[in-house]
Amino acid sequence: MKKLGLGKRVLACAASAATLLTGTTALSGLTTLGSMAASAASYDNYAKLLQYSMYFYDGNMCGSDVGSASQFDWRDNCHGSDEVDGGFHDAGDHVKFGLPAGYTASTLGWGYYEFKDSYDALGQTAHLQALTDRFCDFFKASTKLSGDTVTSFCYQVGVGQADHDVWCSPESQNDQSLRTAYWTSDDASDIAAEYAAALAVNYINFGNAEDLKYAKALYNYSIK
């Protein structure tokens, strides 16, 4: 798939802003809705909105393969020395937080499960799978197993407040003191459950047996 430059980045933001404008206008009353009727069609291109909204994740990819994996040509490899490579930055910083990542991945996967035909018809399935597979690859790399039992898992990579104090591109953030990996063997059951949910729905959607194996192990960890 062709990489996208700054122009597409601007268009993605514009599409999101247009949709926000449409939603906000709808709340302001029937009179305003009537005045918008003539131009509403120009905003309600939900096929394009779906496509552009997924570019958000290309912009937030982390790892030693970002240069080839991201759809944006202005993104490149970063944080290649992380103890757990890959995944996605949290929005607005360079930390990889487990809870929002797990929730996001499971929500993306469930959206595809519910509306598979729409993704297929719009040609967006391959992009969606690339994103959910990347999330799930990170969750599996973050999980240490003994047989089918989780012995420990990583629930965060990066130091929250210290990272928030640094303003730079991820490609130029080379201070390894900011890239601590946090592991646990008997805590963070909520995060383990989110990982499990994301892996389970990705297995349902795309059939990777390893996703199911890790989903079961993390689920069992989360309820023990």
Residue map of PLM features:
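Low-complexity, Ser/Thr/Pro/Gly-enriched N-terminal "stalk/linker" regions
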Residues: 37-99, 103, 133-184, 188, ...
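Well-ordered alpha-helical scaffold segments within catalytic/enzyme domains
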Residues: 42, 55-58, 63, 105-122, ...
